[in-house]
C-alpha cells in the first residue's frame, strides 16, 4: 500500500503505520494506547509474507489455539479447508491447551446423518496436514450456529468463546 509500512511482530501480528491510518480512537486513550504502540497500529490479525512478499492473513490473534505442546495454530485456515466441501456447512475447530484438535461440525442437509461421509472428508483433509493440525475427532451438531443463539456475529463470524461454552460437554467428550 502506497506510503504505508507493514511488518510482523515476533508473534506474527500484522503491524501497520502510515499517514493514512487512524491516529487513535475517538475520546478513548486507553484503547488507543493498547492499539497504537510506538507509531505502529497493532491490527489483531496474524500473518506471514510468502516467497513473493505478499502478505497472507492467517486469522485473528485472539482466536489462536495454543495446544498443550505450546504450538500456535490458526483455526480459520483449517476451517476453510473443510468449508471448501459442499457437505460441510459450518465447522469450529477447538483445542486450546489440549493434546490434539477436535471440531464441531454442522453438515449439509444432504448428509446430515451420514457420519461416515463426514469422516471420509476429515480423512481426506487430514492427509495433507501436519500431525499437530490434524483434526482427530469431531462432533456433529444438530442445529447450525446462529445470530439468534448468539453464536454468530451479525457478519456471520463464529463467536468461539460462546460456542465453546454452549458445547462444553460435547467438546470435552472428544478428549475421553
Question: What is the role of each PLM region?
Answer:
Residues 8-10, 18, 23-24, 46-134, ...:
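AMP-binding/adenylate-forming catalytic core of the ANL superfamily
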Residues 31-32:
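Short secondary-structure edge/capping micro-motifs at helix/strand boundaries
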Residues 14:
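Loop-rich non-cytosolic ectodomains and luminal regions
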Residues 1-3, 41:
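Short coil-to-beta-strand transition motifs
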Residues 167-176:
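Acidic/polar alpha-helix N-cap and adjacent early helical turns
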